[in-house]
Amino acid sequence: MALSHDIKAEVVQGYATHVGDTGSPEVQVALLTTRIEGLTDHFKVNKHDHHSRQGLLRMVGQRRKLLDYLKKRDVNRYRTLIERLGLRK
């Protein structure tokens, strides 16, 4: 499920580390989280959409890899991001 331009710009602006930042791990994880949340809502209605579920699992895996990278590089940025996104309990 693609994100609209407005939603994507809002997420990028909210998590960017500097002006014009679209590639930092924080921005990438935030965008993936937004897409994952959208697909999660989609699956509540469409339980048998297995093809989209494959894409969801790929996105979750990619997000996990980015979070692992960020945790290795800078634990403080990782913890801040996890807290802002509400990913861990």
From Swiss-Prot:
Q: Which InterPro entries match?
A: Ribosomal_uS15, Ribosomal_uS15_bac-type, uS15_NS1_RNA-bd_sf
Gene Ontology molecular function terms on file: rRNA binding; structural constituent of ribosome
Taxonomy, superkingdom:
Bacteria
Q: Which UniProt keyword terms apply here?
A: Ribonucleoprotein, Ribosomal protein, RNA-binding, rRNA-binding
CDD domains linked to this entry: Ribosomal_S15p_S13e (cd00353)
Q: Name one GO cellular component term.
A: cytosolic small ribosomal subunit
Q: One Pfam annotation, family name?
A: Ribosomal_S15
* GO BP annotation list: translation
Q: How does it assemble?
A: Part of the 30S ribosomal subunit. Forms a bridge to the 50S subunit in the 70S ribosome, contacting the 23S rRNA.
Q: Which family does it belong to?
A: Belongs to the universal ribosomal protein uS15 family.
Described purpose of this protein according to its UniProt entry = One of the primary rRNA binding proteins, it binds directly to 16S rRNA where it helps nucleate assembly of the platform of the 30S subunit by binding and bridging several RNA helices of the 16S rRNA.
Q: What is this protein called?
A: Small ribosomal subunit protein uS15
Organism of provenance: Acidithiobacillus ferrooxidans (strain ATCC 23270 / DSM 14882 / CIP 104768 / NCIMB 8455)
What are the leading ranks of the lineage? Bacteria, Pseudomonadati, Pseudomonadota, Acidithiobacillia, Acidithiobacillales
